């Protein structure tokens, strides 16, 4: 079986770290053990510096990061990660498990920020070409649930401090995009933890078995 790229998506507090652990455990039970893990923005020295710039509320002092500057920094970090880490890993037969990818930009910047969706799609295609994840698990939570969990973790980053309206628009765009793409599987992450973990296991197991069919 050829290596695959699996991405975990969702609002802050959706449970992406727990989901990643369940995905890894499930893949290992299916005999897949050669894996690497990525996060966006980040995952390379350059991309981590861009992550600090775009997420650390103190990174540029009093200067306001404009919406377009923000999205371009996300794409700069993304293409560096894809070209130097993800594609080489896949070419070497290693599975890649990612914490966020382009769907985040389409939802957060296209939905939350209200940036023109055609422009974002054009930018995505120019930067990434036809490169896409093989499977995306979208963990769906309401902003109320997600931000409550995020706040319990500690200090919020620049984007986590956005309004409920911002996150409601982001979630709506996530759901809209998920409904349009069969490679995106929506998991109700407001369920009890065991139910969420079970849904992830079932989704990943069935998907891998279909690859073998």
UniProtKB/Swiss-Prot annotation:
The answer to keyword Kinase applying to this record is yes
Q: Which protein is depicted?
A: Thymidylate kinase
- Which InterPro entries would you find in this protein's record? P-loop_NTPase (IPR027417), Thymidylate_kin-like_dom (IPR039430), Thymidylate_kin_CS (IPR018095), Thymidylate_kinase (IPR018094)
Which keywords label this protein?
A: ATP-binding, Kinase, Nucleotide biosynthesis, Nucleotide-binding, Transferase
Any one annotated GO CC term: cytosol
Q: Which reaction does it catalyse?
A: dTMP + ATP = dTDP + ADP
Per the record, the similarity remark reads: Belongs to the thymidylate kinase family.
Q: What does the record give under GO molecular function? A: ATP binding; dTMP kinase activity
């Amino acid at each position: 079986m050829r290596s695959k790229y699996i991405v975990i998506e969702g609002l802050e507090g959706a449970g992406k770290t727990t989901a990643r652990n369940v995905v890894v455990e499930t893949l290992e039970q299916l005999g897949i053990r050669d894996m690497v893990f990525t996060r966006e923005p980040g995952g390379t020295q350059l991309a981590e510096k861009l992550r600090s710039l775009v997420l650390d509320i103190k990174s540029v002092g009093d200067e306001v990061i404009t919406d377009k500057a923000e999205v371009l920094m996300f794409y700069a970090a993304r293409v560096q990660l894809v070209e130097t880490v993800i594609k080489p890993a896949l070419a070497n037969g290693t599975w890649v498990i990612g914490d966020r990818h382009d769907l985040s930009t389409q939802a957060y910047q296209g939905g939350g920020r209200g940036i023109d969706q055609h422009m974002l799609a054009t930018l995505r295609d120019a930067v990434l070409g036809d490169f896409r994840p093989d499977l995306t698990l979208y963990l769906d939570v309401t902003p109320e649930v997600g931000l409550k969990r995020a706040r319990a973790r500690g200090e919020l980053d620049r984007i986590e401090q956005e309004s409920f309206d911002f996150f409601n628009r982001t979630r709506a765009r996530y759901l809209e995009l998920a409904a349009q793409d069969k490679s995106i599987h929506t998991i109700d992450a407001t369920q009890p933890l065991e139910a969420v973990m079970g849904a992830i296991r079932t989704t990943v197991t069935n998907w891998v078995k279909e690859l073998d069919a």
